[in-house]
């Protein structure tokens, strides 16, 4: 066995495997926590939304550990790791899933919304993995990071989301090589549309709805969160390098160079003026922050703004 072909310690067949999941209060994270429980694992739930996180923990079981933390703060993620080790003694898997979206064209998008998207989606992944890394090395564990289909398909008016997810994929490609010598596996999740609060809140933007309407049928399809969770947990068990949702996404990934050729962008180019006009209507009605975030993230941002005053 060469240095480039490391053997990894198996973990999924053990009587106990501890899986830390960020963004676990809802959507993909919540569904994954339930699936981990169904497969006999021990989920640790992390989110910055305290009330829905506590409710989700009760659904997983009365003794389920949950930690209210903002992934953009490295110290907070170190505390999550310390609390997990105090309760469970180990961390076998980390699913860096927490994410938000910003929506709006370059000329009008709220800069704070754009920045927040990058902070959560990029630095949040870094902080999560960095904090848990010593524990993962101890267990020869596995990391899965959520890059989404937007890591290689970059729609207009979602530049922050696309840029952040492209960064996540790049981080994963680098880290996979770095961590192999430490017997830690790393996978990147490339998921299309999943019925989650993030997607539901996006549908409140007429411009977002128009954007999705430009996409051909297969690219506009949605998976349910439970179906997504089954694919994700199966990927964890296999220590997969990449997890595809749906499976045909791997074909699109292989053809990624074609996605931004002129012929492929033609329909988006035609729709772009209408998408921008719809965005501006929302901007006039609600302001830049409201148009750039869904209601959940907007409320979080407003709360943080009040706390700073």
Which residue stretches match the model-derived regions?
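SDR active-site lid
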Residues: 181-249
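The beta1-alpha1 cofactor-binding region of Rossmann-like NAD(H)/NADP(H)-dependent oxidoreductases
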Residues: 68-79, 111
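Substrate-binding pocket helix/loop in short-chain dehydrogenase/reductase
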Residues: 105-106, 110-115
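Conserved glycine-rich cofactor-binding loop
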Residues: 25-26
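Residue(s) in the substrate-gating loop at a strand-loop-helix junction
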Residues: 148
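Active-site helix of classical SDR
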Residues: 129, 164
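Conserved glycine-rich Rossmann-like NAD(P)H-binding loop of the short-chain dehydrogenase/reductase
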Residues: 39-55
């Amino acid at each position: 066995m060469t240095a480039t072909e490391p053997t990894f310690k198996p973990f999924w067949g053990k009587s106990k495997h501890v899986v830390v999941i960020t963004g676990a209060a809802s959507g993909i994270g919540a569904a994954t926590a339930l699936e981990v429980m169904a497969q006999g694992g021990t989920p640790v739930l992390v989110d910055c939304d305290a009330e829905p996180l506590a409710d989700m923990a009760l659904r997983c079981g009365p003794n389920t550990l949950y930690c209210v933390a903002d992934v953009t703060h490295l110290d907070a993620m170190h505390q999550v790791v310390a609390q997990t080790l105090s309760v469970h003694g180990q961390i076998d898997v980390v699913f860096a899933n927490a994410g938000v979206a910003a929506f709006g064209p370059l000329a009008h998008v709220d800069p704070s919304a754009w920045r927040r998207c990058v902070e959560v989606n990029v630095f949040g992944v870094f902080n999560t993995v960095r904090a848990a890394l010593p524990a993962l090395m101890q267990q020869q564990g596995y990391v899965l990071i959520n890059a989404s289909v937007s890591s290689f398909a970059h729609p207009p008016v979602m530049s922050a989301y696309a840029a952040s997810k492209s960064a996540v994929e790049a981080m994963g490609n680098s880290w996979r090589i770095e961590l192999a010598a430490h017997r830690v596996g790393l996978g990147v999740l490339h998921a299309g549309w999943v019925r989650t609060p993030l997607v539901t809140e996006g549908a409140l933007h007429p411009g977002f709805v128009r954007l999705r309407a430009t996409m051909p049928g297969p690219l506009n399809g949605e998976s349910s969160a439970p179906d997504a969770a089954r694919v994700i947990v199966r990927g964890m068990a296999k220590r997969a390098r990449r997890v595809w949702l749906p499976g045909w996404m791997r074909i699109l990934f292989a053809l990624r160079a074609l996605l931004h050729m002129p012929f492929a962008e033609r329909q988006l180019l035609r729709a772009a003026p209408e998408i921008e006009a719809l965005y501006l209507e929302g901007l006039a009605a609600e302001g830049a922050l409201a148009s750039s975030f869904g209601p959940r993230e907007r409320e979080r941002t407003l709360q943080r703004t009040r706390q700073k005053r």
